[in-house]
């Protein structure tokens, strides 16, 4: 089966949806929308639709474009996924697709502990029980929203109150149903091929001719056709589901189709929000399907891994990533997982590294980076999209450089008591730049990192052998807050007051402390020299605040 890109946009795309969409019956779209239209009409006009009006609505819904039907079905599947407990979502996919023997699939209960109700994206005050929705979607049985008492659970079901496994749900048939099934006269009974035409004995006797009035607008042939037809039938070849790399649960699905999902489609900036009555009354207690409108969560990781808790800095590596962006332009708008061998020498990040949503913007520096980069290769991993801060690599000598801060941030810097990176890598990182080869006599400031004290700088580093007392480094922090996606990393001014007293009691008499706000963007260091306490600044660094490292109160700022 193929799917239109209108149906499965980047917001609607999900392996959970792609696996289940071929099993949704075509009657589901027409049936749910028809019932919602009838309900809205009754609320507005305080009377029921006439047969002609209802038939016109039915014909309109049946003739709707397949792409529209699939888009609706994909959004409804996404909503159902939220209502299924996380640990049962995989079993649900495998059992519906026929790859596993049916087992119980429990849903998240409502506030009273009962099965939840949803409005099936029609924004009408008509809600459906989840088990009813499952039967209509995957079995094509035209049940009413009030037919919940007609449903019975299989004897093998261990939790009948919350189970939404379609194979465990049956429809009870009473005597009246059997009687009507035998005697009801269809409008097309006179046409060849109809049940009544083929078997005259099924025609009701004279005393029953006026006993039955057909209130629906579907005939038998229509119901059978739409209940047996998948909702994906009749669409063009534009969107794949056949290949889901590294997804062992779907590797044999549609094995005859060899397709590859395009990664070059532009990410949507905003997902249309669905306002539903049941969401207003009872929001789902679980996470969202698209982890947010622009969720860092959806696209490149497997559907069951996105539900894992990512609060720990140590993340579990999947068996194989679904895909990796081949270029900065092809990067997915969601988080991509890279194997560990892509970044050797970074023990602080166990098993995986998260790439950010978009490649970093070009540097606004008016001079080329080669002017301040050393020709020798650095020890950290170089990637056009991912930047690894040098503090993640204890062997990287660039950790000795002092990063700068973002002057546009209004927050006050606070010390980091642990002296280590906190949690995840939240945004883009630019490597700390080494001193220019033209200033070979300049030496970087040495940082002493401890677990109990703020990061301190020893004054002995300024008077080391071979280093002039006047040689200093300056940290560049751009005025433009969008420079390299600046995060909340800041460096406070020196922890001395004007009387020369240390602000932190833990600081010794020969140390000067700096503090961190939070991990974020790393700024560059440019060597400069001080003559008679006057900094000799580079000529090509306008629009940057210069914080001199080495003397407490000697600061300079270049003018525009």
Swiss-Prot record:
GO BP annotations listed: anterior commissure morphogenesis; chondrocyte differentiation; club cell differentiation; commissural neuron axon guidance; DNA replication; glial cell differentiation; lung ciliated cell differentiation; negative regulation of epithelial cell proliferation involved in lung morphogenesis
Family classification: Belongs to the CTF/NF-I family.
Annotated PROSITE patterns: CTF_NFI_1 (PS00349), CTF_NFI_2 (PS51080)
Role, per record: Recognizes and binds the palindromic sequence 5'-TTGGCNNNNNGCCAA-3' present in viral and cellular promoters and in the origin of replication of adenovirus type 2. These proteins are individually capable of activating transcription and replication.
Motif 9aaTAD, residue numbers: 396-404
GO cellular component, one term: nucleus
Ranges annotated as DNA-binding: 1-195
Domain of life where this protein originates: Eukaryota
InterPro entries to which the protein is assigned, alphabetical: CTF/NFI, CTF/NFI_DNA-bd-dom, CTF/NFI_DNA-bd_CS, CTF/NFI_DNA-bd_N, MAD_homology1_Dwarfin-type
UniProt entry keywords in alphabetical sequence: Activator, DNA replication, DNA-binding, Nucleus, Transcription, Transcription regulation
Official protein name in the record: Nuclear factor 1 B-type
Upper taxonomic lineage: Eukaryota, Metazoa, Chordata, Craniata, Vertebrata
Region (Disordered): 257-369, 384-445
Pfam families, sorted: CTF_NFI (PF00859), MH1 (PF03165), NfI_DNAbd_pre-N (PF10524)
UniProt-annotated location(s): Nucleus
């Amino acid at each position: 089966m193929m799917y239109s890109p209108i149906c499965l946009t980047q917001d609607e795309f999900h392996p959970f949806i792609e696996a289940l969409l071929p099993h949704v019956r075509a009657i589901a779209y027409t049936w749910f929308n028809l019932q919602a239209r009838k309900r809205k009409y009754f609320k507005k006009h305080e009377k029921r639709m006439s047969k002609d009006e209802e038939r016109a609505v039915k014909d309109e819904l049946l003739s709707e474009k397949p792409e529209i039907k699939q888009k609706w079905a994909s959004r409804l599947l996404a909503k159902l996924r939220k209502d299924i407990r996380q640990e049962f979502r995989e079993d649900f996919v495998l059992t519906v697709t026929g790859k596993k023997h049916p087992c119980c699939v429990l849903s998240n209960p409502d506030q009273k502990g009962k099965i939840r109700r949803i409005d099936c994206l029609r924004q009408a005050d008509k809600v459906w029980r989840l088990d009813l929705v499952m039967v209509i979607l995957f079995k094509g049985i035209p049940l009413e929203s009030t037919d919940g008492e007609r449903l019975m659970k299989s004897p093998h079901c261990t939790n009948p109150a919350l189970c939404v496994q379609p194979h465990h749900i049956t429809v009870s048939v009473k005597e009246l149903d059997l009687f009507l099934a035998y005697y009801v006269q269809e409008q097309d009974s006179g046409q060849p091929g109809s049940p009544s035409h083929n078997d005259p004995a099924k025609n009701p006797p004279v005393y029953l001719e006026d006993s039955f009035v057909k209130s629906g607008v579907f005939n038998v042939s229509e119901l059978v056709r739409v209940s047996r037809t998948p909702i994906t039938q009749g669409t063009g070849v534009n969107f794949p589901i056949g290949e889901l790399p590294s997804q062992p649960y779907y590797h044999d699905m549609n094995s005859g189709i060899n397709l590859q999902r395009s990664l070059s489609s532009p990410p949507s900036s905003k997902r249309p929000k669905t306002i539903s009555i049941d969401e207003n009354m009872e929001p789902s207690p679980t996470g969202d399907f698209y982890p947010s409108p622009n969720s860092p969560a959806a696209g490149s990781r497997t559907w069951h891994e996105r539900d894992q808790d990512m609060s720990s800095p140590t993340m579990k590596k999947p068996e194989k990533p679904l895909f990796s962006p081949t270029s900065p332009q092809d990067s997915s708008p969601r988080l991509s997982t890279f194997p560990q061998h892509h970044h050797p020498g970074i023990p602080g990040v166990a098993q995986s590294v998260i790439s950010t949503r978009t490649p970093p913007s070009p540097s606004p520096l008016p001079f080329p980076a080669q002017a301040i980069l050393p020709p020798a290769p650095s020890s950290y991993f170089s990637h056009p999209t991912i930047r690894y801060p040098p503090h993640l690599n204890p062997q990287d000598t660039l950790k000795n450089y002092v990063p700068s801060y973002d002057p546009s941030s209004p927050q006050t810097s606070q010390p980091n008591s642990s002296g280590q990176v906190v949690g995840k890598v939240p945004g883009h990182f630019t490597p700390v730049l080494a001193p220019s080869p033209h200033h070979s006599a300049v030496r970087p400031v040495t940082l002493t990192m401890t677990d109990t004290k703020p990061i301190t700088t020893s004054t002995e580093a300024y008077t080391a052998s071979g280093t002039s007392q006047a040689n200093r480094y300056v940290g560049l922090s751009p005025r433009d807050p969008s420079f390299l996606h600046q995060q909340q990393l800041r460096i406070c001014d020196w922890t001395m007051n004007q009387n020369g007293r240390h602000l932190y009691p833990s600081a010794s008499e020969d140390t000067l402390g700096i503090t961190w706000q939070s991990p974020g963007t790393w700024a560059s260091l440019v060597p400069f020299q001080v003559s008679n306490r006057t900094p000799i600044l580079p000529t090509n660094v306008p629009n940057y605040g210069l914080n001199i490292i080495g003397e407490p109160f000697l600061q300079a700022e270049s003018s525009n």
